[in-house]
Amino acid sequence: EILIGLVGSEMCIRDRIKSVWLTPHIMEDIPNTTAHLRDRFAELQAAYTGGVQLHLAAENMLDNLFEERLGKNDLLPLGENGDHLLVETSYFSPPMGLKNILLRIKSKGYHPVLAHPERYAYMDESDYRQLKDMGVKFQINLPSIAGMYGNRIKKKAMFLMREQAIAYIGTDIHSYSIFQKFICTSVTRNVQKLLDL
């Protein structure tokens, strides 16, 4: 299904997407190991014949497992230099000491990238500005721009786009049917604007 999605992405936004970072979840409920994810990624690379360059990273829930792996530097970072770390929180409440956790990530030499901040019910525009001033980068999800998660989340995503606060764009692909419905249809115009920034 991931392979189909990658082919679909090439068809939908041809010549604009040059590389894709695959970011499986790591959290206490899904305790993927770096070794397991690297093995599965090697299998994917062996099977994929498309023209998009593939990379492996992870989306890390800021929980106790993350704290443990951060301490051991057992991580799968983003970026050509391997110095960006994709992190997420609960949609409804931040972990205790969120800003301190983000500062610890920075102290380890990583740039924290907050996944889908537009979807966090506890965050608003002032929070985004504070985090940006701290050096936190943002990744928004394409379905948010398409309105898949509702108008409030779409407005927050569009605010982040207008502020040019976006470092990465995520597809949030968990199934090909979602990809077809939202990524290849209603999101295209807004994505084009974002890519042209």
Regions found by a protein language model. Name each.
Residues 137-147:
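His/Asp/Glu-enriched short active-site or ligand-binding loop at hydrolase and phosphoryl-transfer sites
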Residues 1-8, 13:
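Single conserved hydrophobic/aromatic residue that forms the stacking wall/gate
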Residues 24, 116, 172:
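Conserved, mostly hydrophobic/aromatic
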Residues 25-31, 178-179:
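A short acidic, helix-capping loop that chelates divalent metal ions and anchors anionic groups
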Residues 183-197:
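Mid-to-C-terminal alpha-helical segments outside catalytic/metal-binding sites
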Residues 166-181:
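Short acidic/histidine-rich active-site segments
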Residues 18-19, 167:
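Short acidic/polar active-site loop segments enriched in Thr and Asp
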Residues 31-138:
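Extended substrate/RNA-proximal surfaces in nucleic-acid metabolism proteins
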